[in-house]
Amino acid sequence: MLREFREQRIKEIEQLKRKNINPYPNRFDKTHTSEMIKKEFEGLNPGEVKDDVFVSTAGRIMSLRKHGKSAFFHIKDFYGRIQAYIRKDVVGEEAYEFFKEHIAIGDIVGVKGNVFKSKTGEITILIKEIKLLNKPLRPMPEKWHGIKDKEVLYRQRYVDMIANDDTLNRFKVRFEVIKLIRDFLNSKGFIEVETPILEYVTGGASARPFVTHLNVFDIEMYMRIATELYLKRFIVGGFEKVYELGKNFRNEGLSYKHHPEFTSIEIYQAYADYEDMMNLTEELFVYIVEKLFGTTKIKYQNVELDFSRPWRRIKMRDFIKEHLGVDILEDSMGRMMDVLEEHGVEVEIRDKGHMIEKLWDLVEDKVVQPTFLLEHPVEISPLAKKHREDPRVTERFELIIYGREMANAFSELNDPVDQYERFLKQVELREAGDEEAQMMDRDFVRALEYGMPPTGGLGIGIDRLVMLLTNSATIRDVIAFPLVRLKSFEEEELDIEGGSQE
């Protein structure tokens, strides 16, 4: 069906060209968006025509009803949909015959005319001129119908956005969230900076990196897993408030909340600590939620989340002890192992830090409302400053919402000797087979030796945040072009064929 449709369209385009009609013109003078037209003319009475105002807009035809000498159709642009009405006695016989013969659902057109409100109260353009701007070679996809594999819509997101307004709107929200974050931080004096994506030594998180080869130097390099260590170098160099919003890469699995290529923001402030970062996190999240929804309460997966300040604070030690009966600071590794085995959890590397993380994984989903999880043990926090009152734990928090980590923050470790020793422990873990343990970064230690002021740092996962704000169940729904298993072009054509209409 797709092949026949495409061949027919190619013939039609050749026919248009023979008539000296360009099916792909270079530009169109669009003076109004659909949203502008609706707002400007919402005060019209049903049946009233605004004869003294001429509008020009363009978009894709999403529906079309032809009635002999007239037709109604809806045009979709980035801002919404607007109804258009074409009549033979208004545009003339030649233009109307062209419309009847060559304009179809899916075509991109430009229209010019006056605006009126229909008898049913819908703002409508009375067309005086219409111009074909693009004649697609493929039929319009129906909304999900017949598509056997949802991954088709991930592979061909442009099809998803054409067919489903919800998808387009979801990405509008995503990029509005990113804008709001930048606006908020810029207003507070933070400076957006850039750090390398290709690194000689990668660090700043516990993750397996992507490895590549730099031909010009004939050396192995890594794609960054986090921006932390270079952003701290900015603080050493004299910057006091910095952030970077961009892509990180971790060569790990896919899940509803994990994606190997993901977007995050990291924020660093000199002369601040993790308490300051908690306040900043609350303020930022409330700012975003109120800007988008006009309230601090939203629904996610049928659960009401309340972002009103202040948020709950819990200590990792206390929460695990309450729910599992094990003390992660006092109990032996054997006791922790027993509890994990009771819950059917396998521990590949029998290290205290790994066991603590596995224990937390068992109880994380019990935290639903915005909550700060505090005071992670030193073993799982190699870049965080030790707590000023208990050196067994760190001045660190994670923001947990709906059982998911949304943010991670520290009072940043700025003691170069302590940092070097913690790197050594990470190296020992790597040598024992832990591919996610951090590498030794001697240049970063050298930077700390020049002196870094007390600093608070914060990292936020943009994709997970957008999941919450768009009520999306999986991370791939909020990444425009996510990773999917490869299929041949021919296999993809078969998958999409059932979801097309002529």
Swiss-Prot record:
Q: Which GO terms describe its molecular function?
A: ATP binding; lysine-tRNA ligase activity; magnesium ion binding; tRNA binding
The free-text cofactor remark is: Binds 3 Mg(2+) ions per subunit.
**Keyword check for Kinase:** no
Q: Which UniProt keywords apply?
A: Aminoacyl-tRNA synthetase, ATP-binding, Cytoplasm, Ligase, Magnesium, Metal-binding, Nucleotide-binding, Protein biosynthesis
Q: What is this protein called?
A: Lysine--tRNA ligase
> Can you tell me which residues bind Mg(2+) 1?
E398, E405
Q: What is its EC number?
A: 6.1.1.6
Database matches in InterPro entries: Aa-tRNA-synt_II (IPR004364), aa-tRNA-synth_II (IPR006195), aa-tRNA-synth_II/BPL/LPL (IPR045864), Lys-tRNA-ligase_II (IPR002313), Lys-tRNA-ligase_II_bac/euk (IPR034762), Lys-tRNA-ligase_II_N (IPR044136), Lys-tRNA-synth_II_C (IPR018149), NA-bd_OB-fold (IPR012340)
